[in-house]
From Swiss-Prot:
This is Large ribosomal subunit protein bL28. It holds the Pfam family Ribosomal_L28. SUPFAM superfamilies: L28p-like. The gene is rpmB. HAMAP family: Ribosomal_bL28. Coiled coil: none annotated. Gene3D superfamilies: Ribosomal protein L28/L24.
């Protein structure tokens, strides 16, 4: 499943996991993407939307 929001374009953030001994390994933080049926124009479509867009009301479900 895609880890990019279809509404705002938010994607994963990249960085390092740092242990107590300060060994570092690459990791990524994915946004909380949900598949919802949303109205695009007059037709319902399945979109991958992040939860911050859902909470802000940027998507009309249908």
């Amino acid at each position: 499943m895609s880890s990019v929001c279809d509404v705002c374009g938010k994607g994963p953030g990249f960085g390092m996991s740092v242990s107590h001994s300060h060994r570092r390994t690459r990791r990524r933080w994915n946004p909380n993407i949900q598949t919802v049926r949303a109205m695009v124009g007059r037709t319902p479509r399945r979109l991958n939307v992040c939860t911050s867009c859902l909470k802000a009301g940027k998507v009309t479900r249908g």
